[in-house]
Amino acid sequence: MMDLYADGVNSQRPAVTNPSESTDSADSPTDPTESTKPLTPDEQEEAFYELFWELNRSSFEAYLDKHPETLSNGWDNIYINEAGINDDGTEIYTSMGEQVLAIDAANEIILIRVSGSGYQGVLAVGKDPSQLRCEVSKGIGSYGQPLEDLVEDNGGVLGMTGNGFYDPEGAGTGGIISGYSMCEGEGYGSHFTLGGYKRIGLTQDNKMYIIDSDADVASDVTDAVEFSPALIIDGQLMVGGFYEWSGINPRACIGQSERDEILMLVIE
């Protein structure tokens, strides 16, 4: 079983540039002795709202009025977690009216309630795409691991399902993956060759691209998983409201926003 840490926009892959054509030379040299001036409290506050741009500011300020201890370690260490199964969530909302379940400022993650007719789930938004990676179970090829254990073993903050796994007659062990995955540069399994299967890959520049599952893996891909279907590519909806066997069931999907944020959606 492969697992990934962390209305999406996933870009189709452009042509791969020559690694030797680096743009680093265009950057101005940095003086290692130059110190960075600490942000004032007001600047820290504005930086927080800029990072978590989706927050409804008035609802967050009302939450702080009720819970002033939230700021005891500063704006960049705000930690709110009411995302547990038995929790009701916070009284914080996004500008679109969605309930906020958790905010982890240090790790730049926000959890948002997603719900509709007959379903609900959680959307995790990771602001720093460089934190995302794919990991394998300790018993890859033989047995899988509970997600919680896999995340803890690899120093992660949160995780979700990646590839599917071989499960003949419901008796699989979770250790043999279906399709192909790449985890931190190492490939596992074999590509799906059936039509409709896609591969989503993360490249060295922390961009996600969706391509056909049987296409060649580019040299700059660091992590990848394969499954079906692709829901959104370049802002275009690729499937209808009911896709073959999917319907309303527990599902997981991953994508990337126009701001390069990692979107990890789990429907319960």
Explain the meaning of each model-derived region:
Residues G118-L123, Y197, I248-C253:
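Short glycine-rich loop/turn motifs
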Residues G126-S130, G201-K207, D234, Q256-D260:
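Short acidic-glycine loop/turn motifs at beta-strand connectors
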Residues Y166-Y243:
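Active-site-adjacent helix-turn-beta-strand microarchitecture at beta-sheet edges
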Residues I233-E268:
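Domain-core and long-helix interface of multi-subunit machines
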Residues M1-S190:
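Zymogen propeptides
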Residues V157-T161, G201, Y209, C253-G255, ...:
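Structural recognition of the beta-strand scaffold that forms the well-ordered cores
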Residues S115-G118, H191-L194, E244-I248:
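A short catalytic or substrate-binding loop motif that flags glycine-/basic-rich loops and adjacent residues
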Residues S130-Q131, G164-P168, D216-V217, P250, ...:
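Solvent-exposed loop/turn segments at secondary-structure junctions
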